């Protein structure tokens, strides 16, 4: 049996587009062609990979629908916020350019029912 891996990249809106690409593949390809043995990702792709890993083989279309709903909800939230003291505060005091608490809260809420695999 062949071992297929699905690697999901990161980068701004790319993670959002992965849901549409996965939905398109799931609706046009035979389930045996869609079968993969491993899934991984970085940044937003890792969020998608964790969500996808919680769906059994053959339910990639359902996983893609969930991804789309999740990323649609992110559009109403500014996921990264500036520090009150600006970039200087971020670099000198906080250890990062932006306050990422909003993205952490969003991921925690959206992935609350996803179990680690």
Residue ranges and their predicted role:
Residues 111-117:
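A short alpha-helix-loop-beta-strand transition element characteristic
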Residues 1-7, 12-110:
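Patatin-like phospholipase
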């Amino acid at each position: 049996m062949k071992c297929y891996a699905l690697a999901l990249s990161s980068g701004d809106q790319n993670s959002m587009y992965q849901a549409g690409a996965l939905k398109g593949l799931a609706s046009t390809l035979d389930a045996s062609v869609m079968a993969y043995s491993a899934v991984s990702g970085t940044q937003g792709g890792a969020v998608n990979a964790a969500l996808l890993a919680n769906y059994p083989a053959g339910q990639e279309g359902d996983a893609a629908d969930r991804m789309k709903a999740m990323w649609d909800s992110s559009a109403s939230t500014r996921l990264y916020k500036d520090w009150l003291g600006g970039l200087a505060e971020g670099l000198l005091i906080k250890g990062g350019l932006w306050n990422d608490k909003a993205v952490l809260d969003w991921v925690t809420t959206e992935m609350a029912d996803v179990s680690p695999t």
